[in-house]
């Protein structure tokens, strides 16, 4: 309710007096009514009284909206039970939320949250914890500490790309060959891996730059005309910058890309990156443009290629957090895989809305805790007897491949993007 209480859900019809007796008081509601204002004054100190006051009031208004959201919590701890971070340290969701809210610090960093939405998925009140983490990170001047970023050089390059001075290095709409109303955006992991060595995972067997090539193999085999919108045309979507709290950088990237897309004549934007897909679809204002993940696009456009594997194959599928829990795309990748004759799709213990996170969010917190989470996921893969672990996110592929590169003989299965897996069968069919 508006006074900080939470009403328990029930399918049973009840009298108002009965409902009143079932209200649960949120113990934190009366504890911290002014603490956020103090944080905002500290974080947003602007000596200019005029503009500064307006900015402060705007940010306080935004934060107050999230304060109301947080007060829906009545402390049932179901979010803690679902939180993957809590499996390996004391950094559960409620600690992160309450400590940052009340200016208390018990050593649990705000950046330990994976923003995987497992907590909201388990919450009976559907509290949007991820949005709170997003706005709190945005109030931290300078963004996350360098120790949280494993690829600092790459992130610095992407941040520099956001500046207006970098615009001239990108091809204009007038000079770019756009010959279709459907555009494909590769994302940073895929594109950069084709241009340079992305990371040490390239020393293994995975080619992170393969997904775009695979996607166009499928488009061509289906007879779909799709324009490649390269990273020499569009900038980074800004997903990592947004969730690292680098709001100013994200807004610059968004402004540039949005203007370019509006002028391009594209009415459908397709990408194989779950993070890019979620960002374009939810964080941009592309009102006249349909944003689709490649698996969605293939299904909607009648994917039916009569594919089959050379020999029977057992596979399992890992649901990316951004594609699954956050965008509700579960069946499309599975439908595509099941369409291949000779494939037996076996689900892991945790799948779909209960799927485990790959452990690294927004290129942050690549540490022993995230490694332990991937080991647990690999144990689930092994339990299925799968020859191949499939997923639909290049970041998930790279993080899992990073662990596989360690050479543990128990991890003798292959890791592939669904699009790459399908393209492999198309190439075999066409030989």
Please name every model-derived segment.
Residues 56-73:
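Transmembrane-cytosolic junction motif
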Residues 193-293, 322-338, 343-431:
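Cofactor-cradling patches in redox/metallo enzymes
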